[in-house]
Amino acid sequence: MYLLITESPAKAKKIQGFLNENYKVLSSCGHIRDLEKKKTKVYGDPKGFGIDVDNDFKPKYVIMSEKRDVVKNLKSGSIDREIIFAADDDREGEAIAWHTANVLKSPIKKDNRIIFREISKAAIIEALKTPRQIDMNEVNSQQARRIIDRLIGFKLSPCLWKNINTKEKGLSAGRVQSALLNLVEKRDDHIRKFVPDEVYTTEGSFEEIDKKCPFTKISDIDTEDLFENFAQDRVFKKASIEEKKVKDYPEKPFITSTLQQTASRSFGFAIKHTMNIAQKLYEGGHITYMRTDSMYISDDFSKKVKKFVGDNFNSSDYCKPGAKKVKGAQEAHEAIRVTSLTKPDDLEPIEMKLYNLIYDRTVTSHMKPCEYLMYKVRVTNKDIQDDGYFTVSHKRLMYPGYKIYYDKSLKEEGKPDINETYTLEECIATQKPGNMPQYYDESSIVSLLEKTGIGRPSTYSTIVGTLDNRKYTEKRDYKEPDKEIKTLTLTKDDEIIEEEKMVKGNIQKKRIIITPLGLKVLDYLRSHFMNIIHETFTSQVENDLDLVANGELNYVDVIRKVYDSFITIVDGQMKNISRNVGDMPLLGKIKGNDIFLGDGKFGPYMKITGKKVKNMNISNYLKLVNKRTEDFTIKDAEKVMSYPKKINNNIYIFLGPHGFYMKYNGTIFTIEQRPDGEYSEEYCMGLV
């Protein structure tokens, strides 16, 4: 008699239906143990967060309070049964199996752990025939990640509480989340400072074709003069023709990150939403495991796709996909694919959308590329041949390849009609600002995380969600600035018309943008912990964890390396807390007086201590110099304190709550608001 333990109730129910009465299938409902967490007199004391720092970072695990009934059920279900652990085939799954074995006092044997990549009867039976031992390298890699993240979170968070002036509660800093926050702000900063180049394009419309053709200028002729030449002779002759074969390849099989990105672009799904649907599809036995770095598809299933392609299209359309390697990929698994080429009829509409996406990709990734023959025809005439040429493009379908999956009517096309002459109808030259950079959305965030090696696909959803939950970022639409566009048009009637118009800026939908609170937290982390929030550090930790999983590094050494990189700074920061006034951080000293930065109901201000305590509002100063509160430095404080500034015996410049103003013999004058706050005597006397 056997007890088979998986981590999901839905998965347990599905598997129970495949097995006979000798097997009982129960679920652990995820992790049943976690690091101990208890209150201590001093927050940040290692004794409070379940890690013995002085004993090789030995963890202390306790059963989670909400899982006590689950554990009780597992213990009673294991009586007189041999236990088999069937959690997911990844590091979290391996750790769940190990923790469950420890709690149930089940020995780590060579044959009590099974793995499978799809929930089907054949896959489960095969897994039971080939059991293995719980992989302690994978377990230790997961333990190292958990311990590192607990250490950083519990050690850095008190520094944030004491050094950041905010009404928000529960500030915290995580290793991976902080690295992403840093990258999000870099993009924000790049957009703030972006100055677009002017883009110039010239396009012509011809009688013989139904699309606009670009003009390539090869001289410095003025556009208006060029258009006058066009008006003199509108007939353009073929000067040259270039033929080029082009292949349009199908997309590779889905991995976690590409599924998340494609679902985001195609349906607007959030990462978490995509993964929740994929989890249901997996537990229902419709797709393979959805957390994977590998593009590999098994030979057995590829043979099924080959038959499907041959039966529905042509056997010559089949081509087995290559397994391209992804940066940081663990690649122990298959890609995300459907488990059967017969579609289910019991899915919810939202589930069917994602299922069809995976189904289509499974099939088309096994098909040959679409092939085109591209023709680029240069046309010009004797009046402008030294000034440039138009390019007329034609595309001929030579072989539909994978695209026949979407449109069975596609077939090889004949050679397009390429004229000897083309008659220009109209031409438009446009001058406009170049496109501004895009704020990140969830799809591009996934691409960024993948490119930099921060986190792993299975954690992407959590990383993005954590920043949002902590109010360090927000998801909102962003309207780009309106654009001024200048056009010069040569009409059919030989008129040359010049126009200027304002075009509304594009709306960037659902963008992830850093909040003022996120900026405060990041500014502090950059000032003191840049070494551990930089993407190269976080990526290196991920690489080290991979080496632990492969048995090439000791997990304690990885933890110690990370801990040693920040603990000295943390201790120093905690010692400096006593120098702050309440929650107000100390900027520095000016003439022996401590200067603190605060945020009140009338906006940011600086507190000057000494014989008398004085508060000075800095809201208008920040607007004048285009700075954020987080960027206000002791040098800015010195500048603010330099006012009132004497111009002569009768004239003084003041900095008040509403900006700079002038006093002349006691009379107040409104003056121009200058970021540098510098005003000459000549300027001031001109006002008088």
Which residues does each PLM region occupy?
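C-terminal or mid-to-C-terminal helical accessory/interaction module adjacent to the motor/catalytic core
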Residues: I119-F206, E243-K247
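A conserved hydrophobic secondary-structure block that centers on an alpha-helix together
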Residues: T262, S266-H273
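NTP-handling and nucleic-acid-processing catalytic cores
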Residues: M1, I5, K11-K14, K38, ...
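Metal- or metallocofactor-binding catalytic centers and their adjacent structured scaffolds
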Residues: I221-P253, Q260, D417-E420, T430
